[in-house]
From Swiss-Prot:
Ranges in a coiled coil: none
Keywords, in A-Z order: Cell inner membrane, Cell membrane, Ion transport, Membrane, Potassium, Potassium transport, Symport, Transmembrane, Transmembrane helix, Transport
InterPro entries: K+_transporter, K_trans_C, K_trans_N, Kup
Molecular function GO terms recorded: potassium ion transmembrane transporter activity; symporter activity
Parts of the chain that traverse the membrane: 41-61, 82-102, 130-150, 163-183, 194-214, 235-255, 276-296, 309-329, 366-386, 395-415, 426-446, 450-470
Protein name, entry field: Probable potassium transport system protein Kup
One GO cellular component term: plasma membrane
Task of the protein: Transport of potassium into the cell. Likely operates as a K(+):H(+) symporter.
Recorded topology in the membrane: Multi-pass membrane protein
Disulfide bonds: none
Major subcellular site: membrane
Catalytic activity: K(+)(in) + H(+)(in) = K(+)(out) + H(+)(out)
Family: Belongs to the HAK/KUP transporter (TC 2.A.72) family.
Length: 651
């Protein structure tokens, strides 16, 4: 591949040549799909997957040049070195690592850090807590990225006003806040109607990127020499200290690369790869090389090269298009945050959250009010606190590089445990990725005092919350299990001293079907009655994203009064107990909602010095438990058929 990229072709031709080779490798095991359907999916991928990385040219090259400048002076070798670094970073990290390897590590078609964690946990039985910890760190870093992306993207687009109309400079931050507040405010309405234009707008954006870059490449065609890795290597070795800092800024060109994997389940591998190889990658290269050529011929333009190289007649349209593109990029990140939050709830990493479906046709379109509120507040606070996209740039890289580092570690386990690769085959590849990831991560971590503290702070708080929830639920389960009575013993006692039998069916939800549910025990204690039919219901989340309806329910008859039912959902599926119980008819149980009551136990938690957790963590867990959404709503049980029985537990 490097041979093709070092030839005499233009960057677009080189990327297309590389695309031919890479696409063949990426799709060697897939059949052809219908062309029209493929075009639609590719267009959709442009609007959802590539918004973040597609808007990076607005600020990435500018920040890299600022880092590379010595006393504010840029040499020709510096400019060529920076653009060469960007080219090879995009090639090695996005095209090689993600396109050729990471996108193959799907969990039944789904991607994302939590999908990868679930996949690895299923394959690596020995150390589930270690993998869970890695997955939690990855998810926390993703949310940190989700906070910073809308802030830096929209703010960088609005800074174009400084070029179009300098007198509007004081309004950049207020206008950014207005746009972001509006964006988060309309989330509850759903994006189904407007999402249809996301793809075409982003396609226009990439055309504008490529066209403006190609036009200015002719300012200094010798800029294409930077395709040669010699310029990147020379830049890294001549002044290592300056180069190290610059590498952290160069990484801004790759922010959003993780979206290729995160959105795998929405579009599939082939549309995502084709969109990258044939549209996004070439257009990004043209723009970056165009900015470099423009600066080589207009040395004074390093302040805002992206907008300064746009002709005056096209400045306003470009600012408007950039704003639209960054809003779309922000929307994609917000939607991704909802998806990851839902996965985290299903995998019991976060407490239950209220999840609203905004589309009757598309089940994946959801809105989570609490996530939206917290995300929106954090984004606005960042904009008001940092005020300039250049100030936010330092905070941006840490979250994304950390996430990529976690992905690489988990990818090694996938290679050796699931793909059954020999260590001698997998290790050199992973070590290569780790060297690159560690270089970018270390170059960004030194920016903690410049703003990186924001990213680390967000991730740390989220890790603390998620780990407290995981640890607390385990302690609670162990505590209640010690106090619970085995179901066998209760059934045996009822056989000797039968309670009063009343007509109807009682469904008792429990996490442990071997123990008598707390609600059943309190019902017998206070009401002294037993229903004619009793169902001990357990809801299980599988380590795969989707579970077919045929595999949803397992039913076993315990005795003439009791039945054990297990419902299994994928971590991407919203539990609907009513609908799932309807599937039990084919298994011999004729479920009738009109004669059925659901008994749920509502626990009142109190902190205890004997919980095994620090007191502050006990209190945090109790707070999280109190803020969890109602089980009746979460499991979609008709409220008129629910009986809640309260219990007090000292954890």
């Amino acid at each position: 591949m490097s041979g093709e990229l070092n030839g005499n072709d233009t960057s677009a031709q080189a990327a297309v040549s590389a695309g031919s080779v890479l696409e063949g490798a990426a799709f060697a095991d897939e059949g052809e799909q219908h062309n029209e359907s493929m075009k639609t999916l590719v267009l959709g991928a442009l609007g959802v997957v590539y918004g973040d990385i597609g808007t990076s040219p607005i600020y990435a090259f500018r920040e890299a040049l600022h880092a590379a400048a010595t006393n504010g002076i840029l040499a020709r070798s510096d400019i060529l070195g920076v653009v060469s670094l960007i080219f090879w970073a995009l090639t090695l990290v996005v095209t090689v690592k993600y396109v050729l390897f990471v996108l193959r590590a799907d969990n039944n078609g789904e991607g994302g850090i939590l999908s990868l964690m679930a996949l690895v946990r299923g394959a690596l039985k020995g150390r589930p807590d270690l993998i869970l910890g890695v997955g939690i760190c990855g998810a926390a870093l993703f949310f940190g990225d989700a906070v910073i992306t809308p802030a830096i993207s929209v703010l960088s687009a609005m800074e174009g006003l400084e070029i179009v109309a300098p007198n509007l400079t004081p309004f950049v931050v207020p206008a950014t806040v207005v746009i972001l507040v509006t964006l988060f405010s309309v989330q509850k309405l759903g994006t189904g109607r407007v999402a249809i234009v996301f793809g075409p707008i982003m396609a226009l954006w990439f055309v504008a990127l490529g066209a403006s870059g190609l036009w200015h490449i002719f300012d200094d065609p010798t800029v294409m020499a930077a395709l040669n890795p010699y310029y990147a290597v020379r830049f890294l070795t001549v002044s290592p200290a300056v180069a190290f800092v610059t590498v952290g800024a160069v990484f801004l060109a790759m922010t959003g690369a993780e979206a290729l994997y995160a959105d795998l389940g929405h579009f599939g591998r082939k549309p995502i790869v084709r969109a990258w190889l044939w549209i996004v990658f070439p257009c990004l290269l043209l723009n970056y090389f165009g900015q470099a050529a423009f600066i080589l011929s207009h040395g004074e333009a390093a302040a805002l090269p992206f907008f300064q190289m746009i002709p005056s007649f096209a400045l306003w349209p470009m600012v408007l298009l950039a704003t639209a593109a960054t809003v779309i990029a922000s929307q994609a990140v917000i939607t991704g945050a909802y998806s990851v939050a839902r996965q985290a709830v299903q995998l019991n990493i976060l407490p239950r959250l209220e999840i609203q479906h905004t589309s009757e046709k598309l089940h994946g379109q959801i809105y989570i009010p609490r996530v939206n509120l917290l995300l929106g507040l954090a984004v606005v606070i960042l904009v008001l606190g940092f005020e300039k996209s250049s100030n936010l740039a330092a905070a941006y890289g840490i979250a994304v590089t950390g996430n990529m580092l976690v992905t690489t570690v988990l990818l090694y386990i996938v290679m050796t445990r699931i793909w059954n690769w020999r260590v001698s085959r997998a290790l050199p590849i992973i070590l290569g990725f780790l060297v690159i990831d560690m270089l970018f991560f270390s170059a960004n971590i030194i920016k903690v005092h410049e703003g990186g503290w924001a990213s680390i702070g967000i991730a740390t708080v989220l890790v603390l919350i998620m780990w407290t929830w995981v640890r607390g639920t385990r302690h609670l389960f162990q505590k209640t299990r010690k106090a619970e009575v085995p179901l066998d013993l209760i059934v045996e006692q009822m056989a000797k001293r039968p309670p009063t039998i009343v007509p109807g069916t009682a469904v008792f939800l429990t996490g442990d079907p071997k123990s008598a549910p707390t609600a059943l025990m309190h019902s017998l204690k206070h009401y002294k009655v037993l229903h004619e039919n009793n169902v001990i219901l357990t809801v299980v989340t599988a380590s795969k994203p989707w579970v077919a309806s045929a595999d949803r329910a397992r039913v076993s008859q315990y005795n003439e009064r009791f039945m054990l039912v297990t419902l299994t959902f994928g971590y991407m599926q919203q539990p609907n107990i009513l609908r799932a119980l309807g599937l039990c008819r084919r298994l011999g149980w004729k479920f009738d909602i009109m004669t059925t009551s659901f008994f749920l136990s509502r626990r009142s938690l109190k902190a205890s010095v004997h919980s095994g957790m620090p007191l502050w963590q006990d209190k945090l867990f109790i707070l999280l438990a109190r803020t969890a959404s109602d089980a009746t709503e979460y499991f979609q049980i008709p409220t008129g058929r629910v009986v809640e029985i309260g219990t007090q537990v000292n954890i």
